[in-house]
Amino acid sequence: MIALPISFTKNSYNGIDNVFFVNLLNLPQIDTDLTPYVVLNIEEPKHYRIKEELKNIFKEKNIVYSYHKPFPYTKVSKLVKNGVIVSDNPMDYLLLYRNASEVYSDRVHACIPTLAFGNKARLFSNSPRIALFENAKIPDVRERLVSIEGLKEMQDKQIAFLASLLQ
């Protein structure tokens, strides 16, 4: 992160990532034949061992696999045959995470919407983006399955700050 002189940051607010606001979309909760289900979104090869361990842990549960990385269309049929959800439409992923009971991922932006929708998530990553969880008061998202508390208050404070700039 770059520290800017105060003259450049007069109207800055050190708030939560905008993805923590997806719950305001009011996406429906949908019961399916898989409900409840766990999402495994482990894409990095260095985390495949973790993915296999999670598959064993949840073998008695309904598991849905998702894939976020851009993909060549030649690879899509292979992913789909293996039961992996892939999409060009972010809403598909948001609906998936809205209705999951738990999400285990090495992608920050699989965990954030899950938490915003009130579900539990755990992150397997050392990305600098982990800092996004600190402002949301969930710094231990890499150590255990977590949920978020006080999200509405954090959202309201950030919205109030932005509204004050428009007055």
Positions of PLM-derived features:
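Active-site anion-handling motifs in enzyme catalytic cores
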Residues: M1-Q167
